[in-house]
Amino acid sequence: VSPVPIVALLLLGCAANAQSDARILHAIGQVEGGERGQRGDGGAALGLYQMHPEAWADGNAQLLREGREPFPRWQWRSPLAQDMVALAYLRALRGRLTARGIPNPSPECLALCWNLGFTGAASIGFRLSNAPAARASYAVRVGNLVRR
C-alpha cells in the first residue's frame, strides 16, 4: 500500500493536518486490508478504506462545504476519488469531535469513529476501554501504524 497520492495532498494544500490525516488514512488502509479494489461487508464497504455509503456521502458533503467537487460513489475504484473522499470524511469526523469537545483526537479515537461510525463511537464515549475487543484492537493497530 502506498501513502495517499501526492496529488491529493497538493489539492488539499499540504497543511500539517492534511499530512497527519494522510498518515492516519494510510494506516487505516493497511488495517482494512490494503487493496484499492476490495469490497467488504457484503459489498457495502468499498475500496482501500472500506467506506460504507454513509461515510462516502459524509465525505462528499464535507467536500461540498469546502467548495470542492464531490465524487459520485460509482467512481469508488478511482484512487483519487477514494483518497479525496476519505480525507474529507476524516476532516468531517475531526469537526464533529471538536464540536463534542475533543479538538485534538488521537489516531485511535479517529479510528474508532471510522470503524464504528461517529454515532457508534459516541455511544461508547469515544473510549477504547468501552469498545468491543475487535474494534479496540483495530483502533490500536491504526494508532501503532501512525506512530511508526
PLM segments and residue spans:
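Bacterial Sec-dependent signal peptides at the C-terminal "C-region" and cleavage site
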Residues: 1-2, 6-20
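Non-catalytic cell-wall polysaccharide-engagement segments
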Residues: 14-42, 50-148
